[in-house]
C-alpha cells in the first residue's frame, strides 16, 4: 500500500466513525466525537490528496512532522508555486473545512454546544465535500465505503429535506 493509500484509508475510517457517532442514540460525547473525527478525516484525506498529486506533507524544518490541516487546506485550495495539480478544493469548500476545524477546536479544548440542526448541516456539508475530494482526486465515491443501509435517523426532520 502506498503512503497516500494509507492516509486515505485512515481518512475513510475516521469518516465512518463520525457517521457512526452522528447516528448514536445517546448524547454523551456525540457532538465532540463527530466534530473531532470529521476534522481528522479531512486532515488525512487532504494529506492523501497532496501525496497523490505529487506534493509533500512533511514540514520543511527537518523534524519529520507532517503539516497542519490549515496548511493542507491552503495547498489543496491554492496549489503551490511548484505544483498547481494539488488544487482540489474550491474556496467555499476550504472555508467549510476551516469552519469545521474551528468547531473542532472548541470541542477539543473548550465546552462545545452545537445545536442539532447545526451539527446536521455541518456533517451533511462535510459529507458532500468528502465525496467531492474522493471523486476529484481518487476517482472514487463515498458509497464505495459506506454500506447502503446507512440512514440518518432522528426525531426531527432535517430542514433541508422537510417538505
Sequence positions of predicted segments:
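Active-site-adjacent bridging/hinge elements
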Residues: 8-19, 101-105
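Short, hydrophobic, well-ordered secondary-structure elements
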Residues: 12, 31-52, 124-127
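An N-terminal domain-cap segment
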Residues: 18-36
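Short, charged/polar, low-complexity loop and linker segments
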Residues: 19-23, 78-85, 104-110
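Short, glycine/acidic-rich hinge or "gate" loops at secondary-structure transitions
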Residues: 29-32, 53-64, 144-149
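Flexible secondary-structure boundary motifs
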Residues: 50-92
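Charge-enriched, short contiguous segments at helix-coil
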Residues: 88-143
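Polyanionic, low-complexity intrinsically disordered segments
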Residues: 131-163
